[in-house]
């Protein structure tokens, strides 16, 4: 990722030292490579930093069994519709999409299970600042006891997160 030397340096150092925090906040404006960096960082956690082409592709396509990638959702006819799918299907809603309590509960369930192919469960939450209070409190509990897992929170407005969430994560600045 071009122009993100500090973020890349901090994450590379963590991988080299094998000192992985249970939570990270990738913070910075939209379009600067936070999601791409999250994928690359997760690749560094797989197979001792030597992921196979198959493993890389599964992370890229977000279909690795030890990875959950959460994005804000709409509720449409009782179903959660990810923001990206709603945009493709031209579903328009009156309320903005958000990270919902059900999604955070799914993370807790996911992290309580033994990873299938890696050393830890991997969770990425995009636009984490869209959470409401209930979801924020549930995420805080998950961060307090992540088990064998890593959470990467991607935010363009980290100041809107609960201070206790921020204090439990290593902040990675993007500019």
Residue ranges and their predicted role:
Residues 163-175:
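A short helix-turn-beta junction within AAA+ P-loop NTPase domains corresponding to the substrate/partner-engaging
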Residues 1-134:
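Clamp-loader machinery-focused feature within the broader ASCE/P-loop NTPase space
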Residues 156-162:
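Short, glycine/polar-rich helix-capping loops at beta-to-alpha or helix-loop-helix junctions
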Residues 124-127, 152-154, 173-174:
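Conserved beta-strand segments of the P-loop GTPase G domain that flank and frequently precede/overlap
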Residues 127-131, 146, 158:
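Conserved Walker B
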Residues 112-113, 137-153:
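Conserved catalytic/switch belt of AAA+ P-loop NTPases
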Residues 109, 141, 167:
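Conserved adenine-binding aromatic site and its adjacent loop/helix in ATP-hydrolyzing domains
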């Amino acid at each position: 990722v071009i122009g993100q030397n500090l973020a890349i340096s901090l994450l590379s150092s963590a991988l080299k030292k094998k000192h992985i925090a249970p939570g990270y906040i990738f913070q910075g404006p939209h379009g600067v490579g936070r999601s791409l960096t999250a994928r690359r960082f997760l690749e560094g956690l797989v197979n001792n930093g030597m992921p196979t082409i198959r493993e890389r592709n599964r992370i890229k396509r977000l279909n690795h069994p030890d990875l959950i990638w959460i994005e804000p959702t709409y509720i449409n006819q009782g179903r959660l519709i990810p923001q990206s799918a709603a945009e493709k299907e031209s579903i328009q809603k009156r309320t903005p999409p958000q990270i919902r309590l059900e999604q955070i509960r799914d993370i807790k369930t996911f992290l309580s299970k033994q990873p299938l192919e890696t050393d830890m469960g991997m969770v990425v939450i995009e636009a984490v600042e869209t959470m409401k209070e209930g979801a924020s409190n549930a995420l805080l509990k998950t961060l307090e006891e992540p088990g064998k897992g890593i959470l990467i929170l991607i935010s363009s407005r980290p100041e809107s997160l609960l201070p206790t969430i921020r204090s439990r994560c290593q902040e990675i600045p993007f500019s």
